[in-house]
Curated annotation (Swiss-Prot):
Lineage: Bacteria, Pseudomonadati, Pseudomonadota, Alphaproteobacteria, Rickettsiales
Classification via InterPro entries: bL21-like (IPR028909), bL21-like_sf (IPR036164), Ribosomal_bL21 (IPR001787), Ribosomal_bL21_CS (IPR018258)
Family: Belongs to the bacterial ribosomal protein bL21 family.
Entry GO terms, CC: cytoplasm; ribonucleoprotein complex; ribosome
Provenance organism: Ehrlichia canis (strain Jake)
Molecular function in Gene Ontology: rRNA binding; structural constituent of ribosome
Reported function: This protein binds to 23S rRNA in the presence of protein L20.
Name of the protein: Large ribosomal subunit protein bL21
Length: 102
């Protein structure tokens, strides 16, 4: 059984005991969070069901930062060069349970 969850503007296909890296959530390590924006999930026969009442329960494993990406701007022949870096804050979750409320 899997579910498709949307958080941080991205969609993730998750099963129980999966570990996912998502955009930063305001939760401390060890805390349980509930992801309520479930787009689709599968039932016992692996049929895709679209439901409004399903939730996914996960626990926070780690609060970390992603790898650095480099932003480099340049204008040719003008001696204009700008280099900048960015590291996005991430939350690592372990999916505990997929709750189907039907």
């Amino acid at each position: 059984m899997f579910a498709v969850v949307e958080t941080g503007g991205k969609q993730y296909k998750v099963k129980e005991q999966d570990v996912i890296r998502i955009e930063k959530l305001n939760a401390s390590v060890g805390e349980e969070v509930t992801l309520s924006n479930v787009i689709a999930l599968t039932d016992v026969n692996n049929n895709i069901v679209f439901t409004q009442s399903a939730t996914v329960t996960a626990s926070v494993l780690e609060q970390c930062r992603n790898d650095k990406i480099i932003i480099f701007k340049k204008k040719r022949r003008k001696n204009y060069r700008r280099k900048n870096g960015h590291r996005q804050y991430m939350t690592v979750l372990r999916v505990i349970k997929i709750n189907n409320m039907e």
